[in-house]
Amino acid sequence: MINVRQGVFHLRNEEASYLFRVKDGFLEHLHFGARAETSDAPAFAARPGCGWGDSTLYREGSNADCLDILPLEWSGCGRGDYRESPLELSIGGRAVSTDFRYLGCEVLKEPPPSALPVSRGQTILAVYLEDAAAKLRLTLLYGVLPTAFTRRAILENCGSSAVHIRKCMSACTELPGDWELHTFSGGWIAEMQHTRTPVTLARTCLESTTGASSSRANPGFLLAAPDAGEQAGAVYGFNLLYSGSHYLSAQKSLQGLTRVLQGISPANFDWELAPGARFETPEAVMAYSGAGFGGLSACFHRYVNEHLIPPDWQGRPRPIVYNSWEGCMFDFTESKLLRLGRAAKQLGCELFVLDDGWFGKRNSDTTSLGDYTVNEKKLPGGLRGLGEKLNAMGLQFGLWFEPESVSPDSELYRQHPDWALHDVLGREDLLGRHQLLLDLTKPEVRDYLVESVGGILDAAPISYVKWDMNRHSCALGAQQHAFVLGLYDVLRRIFLPRPQILLESCSSGGNRFDCGMLWFSPQIWCSDDTDPVERLRIQQSLSFLYPPSCFGTHVSASPHAQTLRHTPLSTRGNVSLFGCLGYELDLTELLPVEQAEIRAQTEFYRAHRRTLQYGRFTRGRTDGGGTVWQMQTKQETVAAVFHGLQPAAPGYEHLRVTGLDGEKQYRLTSRPQLLRVGDFGTLLRHVLPVKLNPNGLAVQTADSLYRMSDGSQSLTASGAAFAAGICLAPRFAGTGYDPDGRMQGDFGSNVYFIQEVCSHEKP
């Protein structure tokens, strides 16, 4: 709902209200939070009284007439507001003040066209402002969606001289009260490290300058009340539909107002706005919940699933993937791929992805990026031949590309060295992963990518694309932004005409996990780190703002290439169940019992896929220190408990399941899991009638053919009992093997299926 009445603007959705008003030509922010009425506007208005003694007055005569103490929807420079400004400009090489005043507004049924991704299905309020002295017009666009609001800005040069934009944010938001800023930063294979910082008088900033949204600083962040929990408390969520360098800041004023800015990074930014030209910012998205972090996550998950990802993939089940990379890397033949395909099909996979190494002379990562012609020595039947053979097995066919990059050792670079991004002063090129970036600001480069990639997609039965990008940019400021606009143009032209293709984006893992890419790609590779212990943290952090339906989650071999850690196959599978399940290891090396375990994982996933991809996600902890993930639909609940290091003599552990009807009966059943005989080592001597060498042939043979039951549990209880906490099967306590106990040791986990007991089943 958008209500405009007597200078008051009220945006309201199913969860929250957003109110502001026109005051003396400025836009005064009134309220963003719990649902309210338009008539409440006067109650929310700031009351500065006699003002503060050091105020710079906008008009002489009233100490309260000072922009520095008011909550504002937008603020300029040099007119008395000394807080951080969302806009910085220069004209003729000199910084200039800005002073935008209200002109009018209109309600639009749909967003105006944009070169940037814009949320789907929103109603728009357009508010028009003007700086008469600078001859500039500013349009603030507000969008209303069922669980979120959006904001962006469009600046138009109405004068006769060029204006240089040094900084132009997407949104300026002001909130009263005390808040903690929750951010998610990190690096390669260490993405999404959750940090909590109190918002104080000192400004807190988080910024990416790499040319991508980056694993260093995810664009999504939260503002939460200090006492907020998973189920209760005020929490705000913010994100940005942008895949380039970005910026956020939060700072509390002496008056108790927290100003939040979000938008394109201003670092080295200088965008020339010619007379008559317009500059548009990326769209910011924000949501509020009074039901804690879980409520806020539900708002954002619904937003992403229903208003962000491509319409053809909204609500569609994601296939179980087998990716060839860790099983083959660059060393493969068609016959080897087909062997892997047969193994993948037998284990329950539905889509075979040929990763790197299929084009040019790509036998290492030092060559051939940009040369997207099939290597016929490896694939004598071409991509079509391979794809048709995989289709005949009952597998879909997917393909990996890295289109934004070029190898210096490639035919493309030798023919068009000017197509790469180079230093503007001609300095020596800096390589990342042995490659350069193509200059996507050039139309001819974009045309080449659209034609070459599009031609391959049309010439073979390809139903999935993994789009990778593996280096940071050396471009600066405005050139970085122009590159992102070029990327979006390429993605639009390739994939909008081919909506049947499932696109998964990737950038050295989670280096570009953002809402801008989700507008094109329904799922994103979370991280190059597939160690489930690390993935548990990464995926939990992602879950605050992104739904599991867009997580690329694969089971890999142990010990893990990123950590050298040994983890159980059960835990690798259990973590990967909560997302878009896939496998990335050499399937031909699996033991028979491992094959059986993977088949059980894929069977469980297919049976509960809708819940695991689209259910309501809740985070929790057990009293035994376990991490709890819960996915719930109206029909069923899937919950998992994950542990770190095994303690000595662990106590009782209780699982609390939320969202059930307290008066109904529910049955909990654990997903069957198995233990390796060899994991017990010399302890086998205490339970067997004969002494066996734990490293000997007998134990190795048993290990390859036999597994022991682990963590089996089944019980029936009321929803009220589940909410209070049901007691789980005991963990290993050093006193023997319990076939009904949980015996995993370090990094163990269990998954539980919970469903209402039908009336005829009740005792």
Q: What would you call each of these model-derived segments?
A:
Residues 7-14, 27-251, 267, 664-698:
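Polysaccharide-binding surfaces and accessory modules of carbohydrate-active proteins
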Residues 15, 153, 276, 322, ...:
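Conserved, mostly hydrophobic/aromatic
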Residues 88, 95-102, 271-290, 746-755:
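Short Pro-Gly-centered flexible turn/kink motifs
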Residues 146, 154, 162-163, 242-247, ...:
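Extended acidic/polar, glycine-enriched regions
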Residues 222, 622-663:
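Carbohydrate-binding surface patches
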Residues 313-451, 462-464:
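Aromatic-lined carbohydrate-binding/catalytic grooves of carbohydrate-active enzymes
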Residues 375-382, 414-570, 577-595:
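Active-site neighborhood of glycoside hydrolase catalytic domains
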Residues 646-763:
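C-terminal beta-sandwich/jelly-roll accessory domains of carbohydrate-active enzymes
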